[in-house]
Amino acid sequence: MSSMDQVIKKENKGRTSTVGKYSVLIMIVGIVFIAANLRAPLTSVGPMVGFIKDDINISNTMAGMITTLPLLSFALFSPIVPKLGQKYGVELIILGSIVFLTVGIAIRSLSGVASLYIGTAILGLAISVGNVLLPGLIKREFPKRIGLMTGVYSISMNLFGAIASGVSVPIALGWRFGWKGALGIWGVLSFISIFFWLLQMKHSNVRRDTVHKEKADSHVNLWSSALAWQVTLFMGLQSMFFYVLVAWLPEILKQQGLNSSQSGLMLSVMLLALLPFTFIVPVIAGRMSGQRSLVTITAILFLIGTFGLLYGSSNLIIFWIIALGIGGGFAFSLSMMFFGLRTRNAQQAAELSGMAQSVGYLLAAIGPTLFGFIHD
C-alpha cells in the first residue's frame, strides 16, 4: 500500500458515512494545487530581473523590490489571516486568495512600472493566505500524518517553483512572450486551481463542533512564548536566505560567466535539489522527539554552499548549488513542521504560522533589497 493510500485510509476513519475515501482524496488534490501556486509566481521573477530592468529602466535596488514586495505583504497580512480563517472559514478564505492571486498575476503582466508593483503586492497578499493557513489545515484534516502531508504540499510548492524558474527564459525568448508573458503564464495555473478548490469545498467535511472547541481552547499568547520566537527566528533566517537566492542567484551566476539560460537553469537545479528533502525531512522530523540535529545539518549545508559559491572553484558551481538546495529543503520543511509539532490544535498552528511568517518575512524582506543596494 502506498503512503498516500495509508493517509487516505487512516484519515478516513471516524468520518461520517457520507464522506469517505473520495473526500479525503479531493482534499489532498486541493492542497496540492493550492501549494503549487505559492512559489511559482515568485521564483519565475529571478531569471527575468535583467529583462525587466532593461525594459522599464529601473535600478538594481528597485528590481530587488519586485521580490521584496511580496515578502512585505506576507509580513503585514500574515497576523490577520488566522483571524479571517477563524471567522469566515479556512476553505472560503483560501478560495478568495487564489482568485486574488490570479488577478494579481494578470495586473503584474500589464505594461508599466505601477502595474508591475501593484500586481506584485496583490499576489503577495494572496500567497500569504496559503502560506499561513495550509499548516493549520493539514493539522486539522490529517493530525496523524502531519509529516507526510507537509512533505506532499512542500513537494508541490517547490516542484512548481523549480519549473517556473527554469522555463521563464525559454518562455520569454523561445516562445517570444517576453518577460510579461513569462510571468503572466502562471495565472493559468492559479485559475485552474480555483476549480479544484471549489470541488474540494463541495466535499468538505468540517465538523463545526470541533472548530468551535478549537476556538475556545486556542487562546494562547504566542508573542510572549520563547518557543514561538525560536520558530519565528528560524523561519525568518531561512526565508531571507532563500529569497535572496531566488532574486539574485541568476545575476550572480551571469557575472561568473554563465548566460541567462544557464543561470536560470542553475536556479532550477537548486530548487530541484531541495525537492526530495522537502518530503523526506518532514517524515523523519515527525518521528523524532527533537529536531536539533536536523537544524545543525541545515546550517552546515548553507555554510558549505555559500562559501563555495562566493570563494570556491567555479568548476564546482553545480556542487555549491546542490548544497544550497539541500539546505533549503531541510530549512523550509522544518519551518513548516514546527507550526504543527509545537501547537495543540489547528487554530494554534495557524496563529503560530501567522506570527512566524509575519516577523520572519519582515526579516526576509530586507534581504533582496539590501543585496541589490550593495550590488549597486
Where are the model-predicted features located?
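Extracytoplasmic gate region of multi-pass secondary transporters
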Residues: 45-46, 224-268, 273-278
